[in-house]
Amino acid sequence: IHAGGLRYHGAGSIVSQLLRDGLIEAQAVPQLETFRAGLLFARTEGIVPAPESTHAIAAAVREALRAKEEGASKTILFNLSGHGMIDLYAYEQYFADKLQDYTVTDAELRRTIDQLDRIIK
């Protein structure tokens, strides 16, 4: 699991339980979509969000667009976990078209899990 600048690549126990209980849902958002959402947020709110926060912003934008399509009035809440002033290099890479979307295949994931199983045993 990876979200921008996060250094903890796993799932917290509280988040995992909330997901298991059906109180939240998980979404995968491609990297380029997250940066587009981050730029939209920066331009409208005047805050450059941290790359990890852009994932939440992108999901909120998706929800807002879905509500608009449905003609529904919704309150949408997301967490802005930090500013991106120390992550400007990531934005520089985005503007230079040096970032790309990458999706791990099921086969790659299975190989990695199999390797972990051998290490742990």
Regions picked out by a protein language model, each given a short descriptive name:
Residues 13-16, 53, 73, 81:
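Generic serine detector
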Residues 59-120:
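Catalytic phosphate/nucleotide-handling subdomain of diverse soluble enzymes
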Residues 28-30, 47-55, 79-81:
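Active-site nucleophile and cofactor-binding loops and adjacent substrate-binding regions
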Residues 35, 54-61:
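Short amphipathic alpha-helical surface patches that serve as generic macromolecular interface elements
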Residues 6, 10, 33, 55, ...:
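Glycine-rich beta-alpha junction loops
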Residues 1-47, 93-121:
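Active-site/ligand-binding loops adjacent to catalytic centers
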Residues 40-52, 62-66, 70:
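Hydrophobic alpha-helical bundle architecture
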